[in-house]
Amino acid sequence: TSVSRGLGDVYKRQPLKNDELIDHSLIFIVGPMARNTESLGMWPSAYNRGGARILDWTGLAGVPNVYNKATGAMFGVIYKEKTENKGDPAFSVSMNYVAEDGGDGDPVLGGMFTNNSRGNFLVQAGWGGEEYGVAFAYRYGQCGTGQRRGTNFMMDDSFNNECWRDVWNWTEKDLYQGDYIAERSERNSHNFALNGYWVPQETGWIPSVSVGYARSAITGSGFFKYSPVASQSWFVGLKWDDVFDVGNDLGVGFGMPNFATELAGGYTPNDANYLVELYASFQVTDNIQITPSVFWMSRPLGHYTANLSGDQDQNGASTFGIFGGLIQSVFRF
């Protein structure tokens, strides 16, 4: 039996103290190990606010291609308006850069601001508070960075923003002799997301509403035929706070995780996959929370679902869905 230990996050948040910043705040974040989702002016969803987090996709506001939890060497800055009362809506802008291989001192293998950094640049502009909010975000993903969640077809490593591609090289063309050599693909991704939420003033049988929509495009060279070059996702989350008793919540989220919308060569994919999540959270004691949940995915393989039939016909009748459940227990001390 092996036991491994490590630090998940190491970073420092430093507010800028200046008498001129009376109505505004400016915070700098820097560290050798941090996530880009920890350096945002606001979280653009109320679905998981103070509640359970069951599936990663719903926990990331339904747009994991932008809020992809990229972890590595990071620096960021958050600008935010100050409000008279806590929870009042405020405008904020945040920017951060995360190099997932920033801890490697060799620029051939990693480092900061190199071709091999696996860098993520995320910028968010938002306006919101406790009751409502809206945010627009953009993430530039260097080659080697992923979109985190989606169909199996969309998340295939050979299709997902790889840094290298195999190119055939003739050594003796007259003899038809040659071999594949590795060549930089110069790929990167451009990811956009728009989110909004509304929370009722009183808890009970009126739910909060959270929505999200995202689009992505992968650019570069050397794409395999039929590989995805564009994708999108959308999400709707409803959450009832204190619906059974104080501290007990009910949530339902549904939508379509990241799925391909365009293939290299101008082909149209059949990559759609619907997801539904339902959970009920019970505050058993002051320190213990129990959350039973169920979830369903209609076509998690996406475009690969056709591989289940012998002819691999995208117009065929191949089906494959998943229904699952989870009981989450949280202990706080």
Regions found by a protein language model. Name each.
Residues 37-84, 90-125, 134-136, 140-189:
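Outer-membrane pore/translocation modules
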Residues 276-333:
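Predominantly the C-terminal beta-signal and adjacent terminal strand-loop region
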Residues 19-28, 83-95, 131-136, 144, ...:
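Repeated loop/turn-to-beta-strand initiation elements of outer-membrane beta-barrel proteins
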Residues 60-63, 107-111, 177-182, 219-225, ...:
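Extracellular loop and loop/strand-boundary signature of outer-membrane beta-barrel proteins
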Residues 9-14, 75-79, 123-127, 194-198, ...:
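Residues on the lipid-exposed face of transmembrane beta-strands in outer-membrane beta-barrel proteins
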Residues 116, 128-264, 269-278:
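Detector for outer-membrane/organellar transmembrane beta-barrel domains
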Residues 1-11:
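Short, small-residue-biased leader/transition segments that mark boundaries at the very start
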Residues 33-35, 80, 96-100, 139-141, ...:
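Outer-membrane beta-barrel pore domains and translocons
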